[in-house]
């Protein structure tokens, strides 16, 4: 358990303030945030863990209601393969149900990679390099935009994306 206040707190990578920004990218951990910043060269908000993301999104929506938000989830597939909940994906989907205008990006991870402990974009960076991270981010974001254009009420899921 944390000794300091965590709920609603976050760290920003790539900017000193949130004012005047055109979009927000939010993820769980620092290493993932640093990887996303390196891949996109855009501000990334590190939310500490999945349990804190909803409060951060709520705070940002209240203060910057017209600024688009993209939530970059962890894919805890290893837990799922053991019959447990995929906390990263489930949390992201719950947040997206509550705030339907946010986009969610979930890293594509094979069962074999999950078994080796790969669960987020930093793990993908360490195993496959920055080009794979960029490729996945661009591919998934493109399909999200295409899907929104074709059917604005449908949420794209990991299963909808094929290569």
Placement of each model-derived feature along the sequence:
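TOPRIM fold recognition
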Residues: 21-22, 35-163
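Conserved beta-strand elements of the Class I
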Residues: 24-26
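Catalytic-loop motifs flanking and including active-site residues across diverse enzymes
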Residues: 32
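Glycine-/acidic-rich phosphate or pyrophosphate-binding loops and their flanking alpha/beta elements
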Residues: 1-21
């Amino acid at each position: 358990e944390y000794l300091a206040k965590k709920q609603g707190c976050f760290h920003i990578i790539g900017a000193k303030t949130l004012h005047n920004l055109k979009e927000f990218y939010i993820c769980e951990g620092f290493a993932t945030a640093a990887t996303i910043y390196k891949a996109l060269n855009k501000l990334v908000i590190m939310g500490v863990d999945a349990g804190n993301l909803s409060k951060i999104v709520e705070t940002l929506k209240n203060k910057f209601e017209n600024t688009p938000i993209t939530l970059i989830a962890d894919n805890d597939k290893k837990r799922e393969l053991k019959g447990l909940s995929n906390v990263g994906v489930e949390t992201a989907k719950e947040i997206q149900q509550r705030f339907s205008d946010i986009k969610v990006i979930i890293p594509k991870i094979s069962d074999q990679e999950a078994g080796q402990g790969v669960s987020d974009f930093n793990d993908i960076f360490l195993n496959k390099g920055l080009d794979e991270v960029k490729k996945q981010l661009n591919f998934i974001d493109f399909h999200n935009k295409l899907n929104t254009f074709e059917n604005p009420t449908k949420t794209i899921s990991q299963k909808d994306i094929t290569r």
